[in-house]
Amino acid sequence: MRGWSAVMVVAALMPVCVWAQVDSTPQTMTDSSKILPDGTAYVTRVVPVPKTVSPEAQAMLARVVSDAAGPKHSIEQERAGIDRWQTGAGEVSKQLYPVNVAAATIAGVPVRVVTPLTIVPEKQNRVLINVHGGGFHVDSGSLTESIPIANLTGTKVISVLYRMAPEHPFPAAVDDTIAVYKEMLKTYPPKNVGIYGTSAGAFLTGEVTAKIKQLGLPMPGATGIFSGAGDFSVAGDSIAMYALDGLSGHLDVPKQYGGDLGDYAGSTNPKDPILSPLQGDLTGFPPTLFITSTRDLLLSGTTIMHRAYLRAGVDAQLVVFEALPHAFWNNPKLPESKEADALMAKFFDTHLGK
């Protein structure tokens, strides 16, 4: 049941890791395909590195990925390794986007408080809540997802260090985020609060929004769902299309998710309307920005969710980046990452307080 964890963890790490190098001798490749009577397609496709992305992104996509799975690690070892990476990546982000970072506890929940060096008076009365990625098992984004946005928006970001699977399955992470949101409502008008997340945090952002509605709480001013999905019962076509589950942008043997989500979902029905918001009523949800990319395993999940929001009458925007993999903005040095972060910041600047 740990497969989805590994997928989502590598998702956050792939864009910033140094790829293992293997034999890169040029080989002749051709397209071929076979389609069965039931519509199942077996496709071998030549996918060159596109010229439509930045030179930095081209270099990332051109690197060869090792087939070696590597040794298995315990959840404790996995978390320790990811924590070390997140600390280092956070320092890189702070060099590009200077902020102050402090540990705190809000409503009994540990958080990181990421504060701009200067907050202008008109932005003092607003706050953003980040729900980090990491496959519901590790923290692969509380710094890298929060630092750029705090700097660019000039707004304090509270990154929720929610309880994680497998020790704490659904709805623990939702409950922790709701507790922080309720506490924010004691200080900030709901229209001045935004919630956003990447990957697992994007799933959670939708779930938290559904829970806010179920509880009858006032909706936040805006949400951001970045490389996410809203239905645990349906994987979507891009899961089967992209290799390494669309984490690196390379193609490989397709993987499916299903039982791999079990550590987080636990005994909850995959069609539960909080676990899978698309199974419920989305009317009244706040303005939402969706961001994905064409080699993201959750391209389908993100676009399906965007259309569901539109059908429900929600003010929903979708941005799809060319050729890049899942959660590529975790590499803060890519020009496309800077563009994505700027889009996120502009969206919250536009909608908070309205």
Question: Can you say where each PLM-predicted feature lies in the sequence?
Answer:
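Positively charged n-region of N-terminal signal peptides that target proteins for export
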Residues: 1-4
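Alpha/beta-hydrolase superfamily serine-hydrolase fold, recognizing
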Residues: 21-40, 44-60, 64-71, 96-354
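A domain-start/cap signature at the N-terminus of enzymes
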Residues: 76, 80-104
